[in-house]
Amino acid sequence: MSKSFRDLNSDLFDSEDSKFLDPKFARKKAMDFLALREYGQKELINKLRSKGFSDEISSSVVERLTEDGLQNDSRFIESFIRSRIKQGKGQLKITQELEQKNLPSQLIFSALENLAKLY
């Protein structure tokens, strides 16, 4: 029986797989994502999952980032609303897009109300 490429290089694959079990690596990846733009909590969890991190690690890392003030749903919502207003989208469309991201309705309406005063 011939050995597969993965069997012959198991130490390479094991070290590659193990980094996805490391919460510190997950935190670094999450911070890399947040350095580019704001993310909603659930969106960031899903982004980490899509990169290969477990549900548990993804959720705990994002929860800690939220506690540390590095991730904030209100900040994400305000940033999202501003970008959509610049694109010429109306309040109803913006609200629908935010609701599709499973963000708290109270935060959405509060941010829309605050930004409506500015525009």
Give the location of each predicted region.
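An alpha-helical, amphipathic repeat domain used for nucleic-acid recognition
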Residues: M1-Y119
